[in-house]
Amino acid sequence: MEAARKGIITPELEIVAKKERMTTEELLPLVASGKVAICANKNHKCIDPEGVGSMLRTKINVNLGVSRDCKDYDVEMQKVMEAVNMGAHAIMDLSSHGNTIPFRRKLTSECPAMIGTVPVYDSVIHYQRDLDTLTAKDFIDVV
């Protein structure tokens, strides 16, 4: 958004414009005004940038993650890659058990789709406490 407000056409904006069958001149003001977000986190090593918002195609999201009942990170990564191969644009990691950090690192290094998480779940895992005992500061510290 910052670059768009300065009139700078980034490589990510060019990619999204092409995917959306728009010109960069059409997309730039949508990003600058906040009507479109380009999801391209610098820590996500292999992301294929996507645009989300007004005037753009609907994106496909897949929810998955490890839990007490399904603890196998390799199985979850297989699901991730199958979802991407089937056209998913976004993966929502709903992991609610164990050490999620290695799984997230694997996601951001191997999965080209946008990735989302649930900070509330991360807080419960990090502090190993019940949700009703966590404070606003606990949530912010985890994020």
Predicted features and spans:
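Alpha/beta enzyme core
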Residues: E2-V143
